């Protein structure tokens, strides 16, 4: 709750265990963070939740017949888009994305990557964590390599995958 109030948002690596609430609807999952930010005693009406969810379903291309469908029945890519929508709804100052394209299909991966770029271009600070080097070099304004919680090197935007791999390998030498 404090993180939300301070403008921090996290899309976790483990979407199914730490991201979605499978039994809740797409609508409820998208509204979770905004509801939490509003605090105890204040509630989004069902109509407000529906309008919010429908806006993000359209914006992110979440494939669902209805926003009242349990999110656990959606594909992994559509679940991930709904988690991204949840955090976009609160307009965080910093969006932390931990392996946001892990385990999703190629089309959903492309859509999510495009949205991440739009968010960053719109001024949102994005911390992008990925083991997919092609994704890292595509979205990064700066690439920082960490090992055991310590910074071992940094590269500017536009660096090649080979340059990143060289930096990683240099630390193992």
Regions found by a protein language model. Give the residues of each.
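Glycine-rich phosphate-binding loops of nucleotide-dependent enzymes
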Residues: 1-173
């Amino acid at each position: 709750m404090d993180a939300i109030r301070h403008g921090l948002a996290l899309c976790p690596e483990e979407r199914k265990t730490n991201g979605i609430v499978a039994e809740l609807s797409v609508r409820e999952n998208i509204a979770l963070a905004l509801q939490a930010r509003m605090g105890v005693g204040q509630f989004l009406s069902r109509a407000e939740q529906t309008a919010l969810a429908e806006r993000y379903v359209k914006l992110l291309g979440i494939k669902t017949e209805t926003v009242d469908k349990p999110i656990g029945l959606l594909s992994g890519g559509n679940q991930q888009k709904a988690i991204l929508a949840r955090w976009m709804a609160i307009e965080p100052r910093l969006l932390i994305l931990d392996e946001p394209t892990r385990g999703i299909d190629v089309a959903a991966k492309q859509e999510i990557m495009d949205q991440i770029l739009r968010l960053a271009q719109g001024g949102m600070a994005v911390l992008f964590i990925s083991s997919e080097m092609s994704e890292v070099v595509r979205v990064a304004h700066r690439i920082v390599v960490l090992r055991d919680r310590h910074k071992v090197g940094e590269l500017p935007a536009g660096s090649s995958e080979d340059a990143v791999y060289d930096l990683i390998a240099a630390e193992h030498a």
